[in-house]
Amino acid sequence: MMRKPEVQIGNSSLCQIWKESEMNAPLLPTASHQARQVSLSGFNLINSPRLNKGTAFTDHERDVFDLHGLLPPHVGSLDDQIVRRIQALRDQPSPFNKYSLLRDLQDTNETLFYALLLRNIEEMLPLVYTPTVGEGCQRFSEIWRKPRGLFLSYPNKDRIDRILSHHRYDDVKCIVVSDGERILGLGDQGAGGMGIPIGKMALYTALGGIHPEHCLPILLDVGTNNEDRLKSPLYIGWRHNRVRGEEYDAFVEVFVNSVKKRWPHVLLQWEDFARSNAARLLDRYKSQLCTFNDDIQGTAAVATAALLSALNVADSGARRA
């Protein structure tokens, strides 16, 4: 079987989205504005969330990539697609239904997902992340459809190096990792906690201008003590009570060492770990790689920034008076 030669896919896809994203983060020009060389075609191309453009593929692209017949004949623009999707989104009966639709869109067409997010940022943020992501984590197993990110389970601890070695992760620069034990105010959600790293990485892209290929959500699945999850026939995680103590620490150590070896300069963000683990893991690894805990340092940094801004406003008002 002949390999499809690499051909450029037009820059009407993610490229223009990154231009909009970088307006939010002008100091982080991490995304390419160039057309991309791809060797996929047909079903493989339209099943790639990062490359799929849906009806926005031009006639020429449909010829080159064997897409005729796989797509309806209408050739639309990204703007047309946004209008269609925002209408479908607003027709949903609840925030969770909207969240589910957006997750499905992210897993099928990242270009359209981020375009929708960026152009309707105030409306979309509460759906992509808090508060709706909480229910998304609780019902994660119900709506799971396609792989996104990595589930590193305790039984696979000896395979972590191999899992991380896949070439699709060559360009990773940022990782958000959780063990699902303290998800927002909802407690232990086990593997459902993956909704948090996925949502946070979407914010890295939408608000920070960081290309999705540089972002990797990871869930450390060390079991769960949530009986509802363990008893549910739909639960997708490791059905086991949480690993604790030395076994837990050894597993995290294997994970961090694998990350350091694979990506020596990566940013590792710890997210929604239990109080008993959050600070001590940060203390243990903060000198080994670029890392921070969002619940400890991120919240504190934002609170400090808000106070400094308020002081500046108050001082400015006092001078004007």
Task: Show the residue positions of the predicted features.
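Glycine-rich phosphate/diphosphate-binding loop of Rossmann-like nucleotide-binding domains
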Residues: 288-289, 293-321
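Methionine residue identity
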Residues: 1-2
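Cationic, low-complexity basic patches in intrinsically disordered or flexible, solvent-exposed regions
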Residues: 5
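N-terminal ligand-binding/catalytic initiation module
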Residues: 24-290
